[in-house]
Amino acid sequence: MKKILFIDRDGTLVEEPFDFQVDSLDKIKLTSGVIPALLQLQKAGFTFIMVSNQNGIGTVAFPEEDFAVCHEFILDLFSSQGILFDEIFICPHTPEDNCICRKPKTGLLESYLKETAFAKQYSWVIGDRDTDKEFADNLGVNFLPISKTHTWEMVASAIINDARKASVQRKTKETAVDLSVQLDSDQTSVIDTPIPFFTHMLEQVAKHGGFDLRLQASGDLEVDEHHLIEDTAIALGEAIRTALGDKWGINRYGYTLPMDESLATIAIDISGRSFCDFKGQFTREFIGGMATEMIPHFFQSLSSALGATIHIEVTGINHHHMIEACFKVLGRALRQACSRTNNYLPSTKGVL
């Protein structure tokens, strides 16, 4: 579904003039940073809808032609930079008219909202007034202000980072896993499991994946470590899949080939289809309190929850290094596959 930014005009896209009316070309000045911010957001797959109150268009105080000349000039400015608005909604009334279309009311968008499916959790209103915040509440979407202390650069960063995070709580009779990921954050991850070696491996995934991972996991180790490792992999896959959202603009594919005395290769396709092929032989039963048979099972569980095809092969002598190489290459491949470098969905089907 669409991710929509409902954007105010005066005071948000262009500076608000002293008399609060853009009726001549010499009053038009773009707000600082608006062009690069909108280009970033457009690349991230957002649809732009302009929604603006314009007091008294068509009156003596605000002739229709004065509005039209300025409005078309503003649209041409943005269009010249590759920024397009899918729809534009203008309320021409004054507050005294008590119309149903003036923000914060939503009447202006009634038909559009009925005909358009969009993801409310990933959609925002951006504006400079309290009425824009009320408008966002009435639409059931998020809100971010534009002001001298809250710039377009900050708005773009907040939206892009927020759009790529997710939390999963997985509680069963055997385990309790509380996990969150933020794909575009390089904060130091905080990971706590009762198996130090497993914790260390997950730290490698987050570090080399370039994302923030917060994890608190516990389980029935008195039975064995199977349930804990499996459920953690499932939660991690679910969180990354959710954080990717509609996968607009991602690379989709990831592959890497790092070496020490061990060699691990991996290829990932975040296609929505689960398949895992793990090739590697471990002659030791346990490494750091973790059964080596759980290594391929971790990748299989991750593949299933993430909806990804994973091919991985590892060879070497030192089993610690072999396993660590597997988790490091997983992180590097996820970093590559989840990176947003395109302005399209990488699938001829139109969905991933």
Curated annotation (Swiss-Prot):
GO terms for biological process: L-histidine biosynthetic process. InterPro entries: HAD-like_sf, HAD-SF_hydro_IIIA, HAD_sf, His_synth_bifunc_HisB, HisB_N, Histidinol-phos, IGPD_sf, ImidazoleglycerolP_deHydtase. GO terms for molecular function: histidinol-phosphatase activity; imidazoleglycerol-phosphate dehydratase activity; metal ion binding. GO terms for cellular component: cytoplasm. Residues 164-352 are annotated as: Imidazoleglycerol-phosphate dehydratase. Keywords: Amino-acid biosynthesis, Cytoplasm, Histidine biosynthesis, Hydrolase, Lyase, Magnesium, Metal-binding, Multifunctional enzyme, Zinc. The active site is at 8 (nucleophile), 10 (proton donor). Mg(2+) binds at residues 8, 10, 128. Pathway: Amino-acid biosynthesis; L-histidine biosynthesis; L-histidine from 5-phospho-alpha-D-ribose 1-diphosphate: step 6/9; Amino-acid biosynthesis; L-histidine biosynthesis; L-histidine from 5-phospho-alpha-D-ribose 1-diphosphate: step 8/9. Its EC number is 3.1.3.15, 4.2.1.19. It catalyses: D-erythro-1-(imidazol-4-yl)glycerol 3-phosphate = 3-(imidazol-4-yl)-2-oxopropyl phosphate + H2O; L-histidinol phosphate + H2O = L-histidinol + phosphate. Its cofactor is Mg(2+); Zn(2+). Residues 1-163 are annotated as: Histidinol-phosphatase. It is found in: Cytoplasm. It comes from the Bacteria. Zn(2+) binds at residues 91, 93, 99, 101. In the N-terminal section; belongs to the histidinol-phosphatase family. In the C-terminal section; belongs to the imidazoleglycerol-phosphate dehydratase family. PANTHER family: IMIDAZOLEGLYCEROL-PHOSPHATE DEHYDRATASE, IMIDAZOLEGLYCEROL-PHOSPHATE DEHYDRATASE HIS7. This is Histidine biosynthesis bifunctional protein HisB. It comes from Legionella pneumophila (strain Lens).
